[in-house]
Amino acid sequence: MTTSVIVTGARTPIGKLMGSLKDFSASDLGAITIAAALKKANVAPSIVQYVIIGQVLTAGAGQMPARQAAVAAGIGWDVPALTINKMCLSGLDAIALADQLIRAGEFDVVVAGGQESMTKAPHLLMDSRSGYKYGDVTIVDHLAYDGLHDVFTNQPMGALTEQRNDVEKFTRQEQDEFAARSHQKAAAAWKDGVFADEVVPVSIPQSKGDSLQFTEDEGIRANTSAESLAGLKPAFRCGGTITPGSASQISDGAATVVVMNKEKAQQLGLTWLVEIGAHGVVAGPDSTLQSQPANAIKKAVDREGISVEQLDVVEINEAFAAVALASARELGIAPELVNVNGGAIAVGHPLGMSGARITLHVALELARRGSGYGVAALCGAGGQGDALILRAV
């Protein structure tokens, strides 16, 4: 049976909303990471056969953002590209689809990942084409409406998660403690050079003088503590338990991996980080988020023929602390063992990028350890979940 491998990958540092990457489009960022990933892999753009990129906020981004990024990165005009929108699952699903296409015999070399500029999301004048005869009109925020608002319950996803917390019974303190650990672990990882293998600097032109090199995630606050987070007001409900500190940050960034048929990689004399294993895809029974990563992981490990206890590296995207806490509890994993180098609460959550970011991070972490199983998992809007098993052998 054909096996797919992740040869290597690259990501940008993650910028805060209206932060260092505010002037870059999602495709600009994607092009940077595609070019960097190919260079790191020692793979010529000419042998790439397909490009799959996740992006959620595409209004105003121009036609085919994935193809924009591919062409700008030097991939040929004869190479097709696909833009995926599966909300927060997009970047991971792009990699999973690359694996599926390779195993199906369609391609041998696929570039896959995710890109997002939440800063560049425009405001929309809905129904303007048909005109307005009288009265006020409302301008809709593309970021909020198409990115962060649950269409099934007509409320922000944070409010939906707050409602589910009434059932899950996670306290404000538990969520604050988890969020603080995310910042502390991410800060320590940067200090220890853990992210050096995955992050490519972004050169930011200046009006005068040399370009500025943007090199580190700018949302991490090393001095964050549960005590400092305790002073924040609830974000979604009076007396609620979720605050801006226990929710993921609105951010900009991109991540790309090079996925290849293992035999092709051997023919080219390449090494690789990991083999790609089973993919778990779940949904329902409603649009809530908390259980989706756990459900997807359970499905993926079952398809892989292993147990949760055999997972050495577990990345669960921190859309909210409550999501990671709930999924860890359902899996029987201690929360401190999830996201050992911090997560989206600290580094940020560019919607289309995050699945690719955590997949790349699991791959690199397994490669550092030399063996073992890892999983990258996320919840997604509409009550869906994806998980991808990786193995270093």
Swiss-Prot record:
Catalytic activity: 2 acetyl-CoA = acetoacetyl-CoA + CoA
Residues at the active site: 88, 349, 379
Alphabetized GO MF terms: acetyl-CoA C-acetyltransferase activity
Keyword match Transferase: yes
UniProt entry keywords in alphabetical sequence: Acyltransferase, Transferase
Domain of life: Bacteria
EC number: 2.3.1.9
Keyword Acyltransferase: yes
Major enzyme class: transferase
Homology family: Belongs to the thiolase-like superfamily. Thiolase family.
Family annotation (PANTHER family): ACETYL-COA ACETYLTRANSFERASE, CYTOSOLIC, ACETYL-COA C-ACYLTRANSFERASE
UniProt protein name: Probable acetyl-CoA acetyltransferase
Organism this protein belongs to: Mycobacterium leprae (strain TN)
Gene: fadA4
